[in-house]
Design a protein with these regions (language model features):
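Domain-level signal for soluble alpha/beta catalytic cores
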Residues: 1-176
Length: 176
C-alpha cells in the first residue's frame, strides 16, 4: 500500500474508532494515549516515504490553541498536508495566542490553521484569531477540531473551517 492509503484506510479509521470507544467508556485514557503515541510513530515512518523533492506548494502554520493538549487531529492534518507538498510550521499544542502572533511575524506563512478539541479552549481560539486580525497583512486563517463547526468559525471570524485532513488539503489547493 502507498503511504496515503495506509493513513486514510488504516490509521485514521483506527484513531476514529479509539475515540469512539473512549467516548463510550470502553477504552480508557492510558489506552487512548498509547493509540496516540503509536499513531505518531506510524506517521513519522510514513512521512519518510513522501516525495521530498516535490516542489513546495506553500507554507502554512499550525497550532493547537492554549489550554488544549490534544494534538492527534492536528498531527494527522499536518502529515497529510505535508504529503501534498506544503511546508508546515508546527507550533505544537497548548500554544498561547501571543506565541502564534509572534510566529506569524517571524515566519510569514501563507495560511494559519488552529485546532481545538475541547469546548473549554474555544475562548483561546477566539482570542488567537482576534490578535491575528490586528496584524497587517494577515493571511487566511482556518480552524478545525471536534468541537468546531462552520457556524462557530464564522462567529469567531475565522476565514475557513475544515472538518478533516482532506478538506484542509482541498482548502489549501483553492486559497494558495
Amino acid at each position: 500500500k502507498q503511504p496515503m492509503e495506509i493513513i486514510n484506510d488504516i490509521l485514521i479509521p483506527a484513531l476514529d474508532q479509539a475515540g469512539t470507544l473512549y467516548e463510550q467508556n470502553k477504552l480508557f485514557l492510558p489506552q487512548l494515549m498509547q493509540c496516540a503515541e503509536t499513531s505518531k510513530r506510524a506517521f513519522a515512518l510514513l512521512k519518510e516515504h513522501f516525495a521530498s523533492d516535490a516542489p513546495q506548494k506553500g507554507v502554512v502554520m499550525m497550532a493547537t490553541v492554549e489550554g488544549d493538549i490534544h494534538d492527534i487531529g492536528k498531527n494527522i492534518v499536518k502529515v497529510v498536508v505535508e504529503s501534498y507538498g506544503y511546508r508546515v510550521i508546527d507550533l505544537g499544542k497548548d500554544v498561547k495566542a501571543e506565541d502564534v502572533v509572534a510566529a506569524f511575524r517571524r515566519h510569514h506563512p501563507q495560511a494559519i490553521g488552529l485546532s481545538a478539541l475541547m469546548t473549554t479552549t474555544l475562548p483561546s481560539m477566539e482570542k488567537t484569531i482576534r490578535l491575528l486580525r490586528e496584524e497587517p497583512n494577515i493571511c487566511p486563517i482556518w480552524v478545525g477540531g471536534a468541537v468546531l463547526s462552520e457556524e462557530y468559525a464564522k462567529e469567531i471570524h475565522a476565514d475557513h473551517y475544515t472538518a478533516d485532513a482532506m478538506a484542509t488539503v482541498d482548502l489549501l489547493e483553492r486559497i494558495l
